[in-house]
């Protein structure tokens, strides 16, 4: 079934000339769908299952692309993070996070064009439910646990620092506060992280996790007590339909 998706999602000129005869009749092409430049998924069945699901028995399917996680363990007890919030940081409720993602998506469209520099790059914009679905899928569990979760992110509002922000969700079964979108100046990262840790502590989480932390913030990881490693679950995987070699394509902001 996954092999057939390529024949629905990709543009016709990027697919093989003939549909594999042994698979029976090809799937129906759906209006306004079959112009994809790429498709992505997150694998929880290892790196090879979806890789073998190509558009023919001989072509690759979705290939794992960037599965690094940076994790900060959360100690028990109250947090002093509130000392930063007043006047310098603004807490975001769900509506505030949604408004931020809308603005962010507009800005990212311009940023990706600049970042490409003649190479091929793409980004999945954080709107049209790309990020909000993660909140929705966890809200049901949070409600069952009696957790009144109101802080979905934080944004700097102090002069030139207004571009620094993070949004997150709670993955209750794994006791993780998961960063879903991050854009932060290096000088403010420790404060922002402390605010996130404070929210995690408030709701009994064991860790804060960020996927593929930006290179600009890597130097701050050790100082803040974080550990970076490769995941063996939730593996971001890419199938590129363009003429370029997939290994030459940059997936920007490969976040949660």
Task: State where each predicted segment sits.
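Eukaryotic N-terminal low-complexity, Ser/Thr- and Lys/Arg-rich leader segments
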Residues: 17-27, 76-89, 98-99, 107-114, ...
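Intrinsically disordered, low-complexity regulatory regions enriched in Ser/Pro/Gly/Thr
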Residues: 31-34
